[in-house]
UniProtKB/Swiss-Prot annotation:
It comes from Shigella dysenteriae serotype 1 (strain Sd197). The gene is trhO. Its EC number is 1.14.-.-. Catalyzes oxygen-dependent 5-hydroxyuridine (ho5U) modification at position 34 in tRNAs. The keyword Oxidoreductase applies. This is tRNA uridine(34) hydroxylase.
């Protein structure tokens, strides 16, 4: 029986990937389609991906598939062909190729079965996820940005919006996508006559969000096909102005893709212009925050003097201190709330 999980340590896998000489390509894709038995599908896909030396993160559910992966450059077309042939619903699926990429984004394959491919908290049996808003292409996005009747809604987390977003886009202040959905409806109630344009990194969140807005009585709803990644790629290919400002946060080792030269965020420790995310080097924290090179040296990659001191302790003492304490290894969620308490950043005003 084939092994459907990793047997090598994470550190060893990372070292092996970094030592590879063959270039890799970072790819993301998603598809809402019915999967009768996600566990059976996982077993088959795991073998397919492993045979092509694919690394990354893949989520499967009855509602579809969501993936961010790294593929050896020589295997990309074979991977595409085999993915398209795997299920008729995947034929011709758009694969988002990373914009700013050295391929060293993942070093292990993790494939999980979940209740949903994106956690939305929706339990309304009458909700139709297929009744989505209209797609917008790059040129149409730019036209909408110039339309005074259009409102752009960012369906990403605070730490993503903080380092980059479309011109004048509205942030939905929440720690998770499931919290954003009802807030988006509430915030837009007074703007039902407006054109609502929703966007996210690769399209998966804004597609479902557009269906949720329509379910709640909004009729003028659009979403950007392929999200920020596809928009930026097509705008560059077509010689259009790129109207996304700053950096596009991504959920892999890179933590961001440079879209424009502007740096719109600031170091969370000294306030200097900076949009480089990092995780606190203290294994008992791992807070995701923005840190400039000066503060990285001053605090040795940690988020505070306390973490700096703790990370310098002998490993056994660090483990003793972490025992019974909530581990901060929540890299990609609840960032704003955790920043408020850890770094002393004031709560946002309403």
């Amino acid at each position: 029986m084939p092994v459907l999980h990793n047997r090598i340590s994470n550190d060893a896998l990372k070292a092996k990937m970094l030592a590879e000489s063959e270039p890799r390509t970072t790819i993301s894709f998603y598809k809402y389609f019915h999967i009768a038995d996600p566990k059976v599908t996982r077993a088959a896909l795991y073998q397919l991906f492993t045979a092509l030396n694919v690394f990354g993160r893949v989520y499967l559910a009855h509602e579809g598939m969501n993936a961010q992966i790294s593929v050896p450059a020589s295997n990309v077309e074979t991977f595409r062909a085999q993915l398209y042939a795997f299920d008729p619903a995947l034929e011709g699926l758009r694969l988002n190729i990373a914009l700013d990429d050295d391929g060293k984004s993942f070093w292990v394959l993790r494939m999980k079965v979940r209740d949903r491919i994106v956690a939305d908290g929706i339990d309304d049996p009458h909700f139709d996820a297929s009744n989505v808003g209209e797609y917008l292409q790059a040129a149409e996005v730019n036209a909408m940005l110039d339309d005074p009747d259009a409102l752009f809604i960012d369906m990403r987390n605070h730490y993503e919006y903080e380092v980059g977003h479309f011109e004048n886009a509205l942030e939905i202040p929440a720690d998770t996508f499931r919290e954003q959905l009802p807030k988006a409806v509430e915030m837009m109630q007074a703007h039902k006559d407006k054109k609502i344009v929703m966007y996210c990194t690769g399209g998966i969140r804004c597609e479902k969000a557009s269906a949720w807005m329509k379910h709640n009585g909004f009729n003028k709803v659009w979403h950007i096909e392929g999200g920020i990644i596809e928009y930026a790629r097509k705008a560059r290919e077509q010689g259009l102005p790129v109207r996304f400002i700053g950096k596009n946060f991504v959920f892999d080792e890179r933590m961001g893709e440079r879209i424009s030269d502007e740096i719109i965020a600031h170091c969370h420790q000294c306030g200097a212009p900076c949009d480089s995310h990092t995780n606190c080097k203290n294994d008992g924290c791992h807070l995701l925050f923005i840190q400039c090179p000066v503060c990285a040296e001053k605090y040795k990659g940690c988020c505070s003097e306390i973490c700096c001191e703790e990370s310098a302790l002998p490993p056994e003492e660090q483990r003793r201190r972490r025992a019974g304490r909530e581990n901060g290894n929540k890299i990609f969620n609840k960032s704003r709330g955790r920043l408020n308490t850890t770094l002393g950043i004031p709560e946002p005003t309403e």
